[in-house]
Amino acid sequence: MNRRRFLQQAAIAFPLAAAAVRGVSARALDANASVVIVGAGLAGLRTADLLHKAGVPVIVLEARAFPGGRVLTVRAPFDDGLHAEAGPTRFAGAHAAVLRAARAYKLPLVPLAASGADVTAVNGRPASTLQGQRAWMLDLKRDEQMTTPAELLDRYVGELPRELGDPRAPQSAFARWEAYERLTWPEWLRSRGASPDAVRLMTVGGDSSGVSALYVLRQYAMLRASTQRYKIGGGMDRLPGAMAASLSGIIRYNAPVVRVERQSTGFRVDYREGAVRSIAAARVVFAVPASTMRQIEMKPRLSRLKEQAIEQLSYYDGVRFLIQVKRPFWKAAGFSGSARTDRATEIWDAATEQTASSRGILAATTGGEMGRRTLGMTPDASLSLGVDLIADAFPGIRSEFEKGASYRWSTEPWTRGAFALYRPGQMTTLMPVLASAESGLHFAGEHTSIWTGWMEGALESGERAAREVLNATGRSWPEQTGATR
């Protein structure tokens, strides 16, 4: 879900940066901090907020010119003040850390309650009713026929989430879940007796072909009782914006970290801010994706297990399409604007609460093989593909199209992917290693949390990293933070 202004930003050549660092070893440090935090996404901002409130001297180094990481609200090129999300679009009622943060910064919570029928499109044929699904001509077993994808999912998952126990259990409990992640999600559904076409229906809307079954089951279990979804009024980027504003003078933008060296008194952190500059720190918190960690030179190197985990973790090749239309034409036909298709695409009304304009925006996300198809495309060709994908569910978009944008996360230089993608066998092996501290080095980000892929995961991991630092340094947890100690 390549969500950002990165199409206007040039990537800094990391190999050149690393080479330049080697020539500045004798130069004096330009600052000191007890803790340097790498990355001003939600994880880094939350870590910085808690440490700052606890009285810890902190400096945050951010490669981009703005905070938020993968939280990106797009306002251009849309008309009438419309906006849409190129990053996270929603969060759940179960996401306590996001709700706490939004309320702490007095940001408006907008419940998502679109009216109208949802659409599922298979074989290029959209349907919003069970009767309409007959046009799909699928080879389903008798007891699978005339059943919605959600009903099929409930049938084949059954009581299994309860068998998993507490899905929020600490990572030390992963061992008992190993049996659930030996297969991919589609393979696991087939092992439960689902027909191939039933599996196809249960996996519309995304590419789960390489995803660990445990990854999906834990998400399913944690969200099962939480049906309400929210977004932040005025744009999701208001949350990192408010958090960053409260940390004035602490964050340095356009300052990508290129090297971290352990020294006798702590660490030296080298970053580019025009020339290469350095900061001395007692501890370092890496609040960046594993894909970004691969670009930072570590001296000495991290542990073998940590290096392997960072190298092996995959990221979803997500692409986000944001399409402005003359009017929200789907509403007149009784549709909500939400749809899932068998071309690994999820679609939704991105401007449902923005009633000041007569226009509308349909957003769509695709990924996996379909997302990789966009890598060699021009922006216009990518946008055209987005319209085609949405037309599978809402054919009227072709005549209503005005303008739009596409965002390819896998080409964003500071992310290289939409969110962490755990493959079979990796959640029980990689995640505990990725989240563990190493002698003054701490690690945060959605990829280290049970809420992988959500803003909740980023905030939660930031709280964990801050807790590690405070415990290690004997400092007290800051009061009135709303976080769990």
What spans do the regions from the language model cover?
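FAD-dinucleotide binding site
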Residues: 2-485
